[in-house]
């Protein structure tokens, strides 16, 4: 689907299910941008890494306590400018692509075809291999809603008895 719209659009803004992007991050999508091809908005992965939390507390980390045990879907490298960092690898659930400059890098020179891998992490790896400039906007305030099954619904399912 991205192959179709990358050739027809100026920008593609992808938001996965359950993701909410704040207004400040939305404004970065519409700002003129000649320096980066793709901007990813790093999000927290589900769960808390209690070992990492314990290690950071023991090491007197200056990181904010509310994010010490969290893992993110994007690994960042060096700082470019305020709130923008290079991306080492990502499995981003929210991102914006500037189509024209990205298309120049991903279009096959011989056939003119565009092939984009359907898996997010592989897609971004292939983009980096082809010279697409991917950056992370770390000031993004992303809210994620995780869907889960209520234990009451599981207990009341057919064939399950609760004593």
Language-model features, listed with the residues they occupy:
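Short beta-alpha junction loops
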Residues: 19, 44-47, 139-142
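A short, glycine-/small-residue-rich helix N-cap motif at loop->alpha-helix starts
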Residues: 1, 21-22
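C-terminal catalytic/acceptor-binding lobe
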Residues: 86-163
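Short, Asp-centered acidic motifs that coordinate Mg2+ and/or phosphate
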Residues: 11, 37-38, 134
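Conserved catalytic core of nucleotide-sugar-dependent glycosyltransferases
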Residues: 22-112
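Active-site nucleotide-sugar/metal-binding loop of Leloir-type enzymes
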Residues: 1-11, 31-34
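Short amphipathic alpha-helical segments and helix-helix/interface helices
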Residues: 2-3, 26-30, 120-125
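Short beta-strand-to-loop acidic/aromatic patch adjacent to the donor-nucleotide binding site
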Residues: 8-20
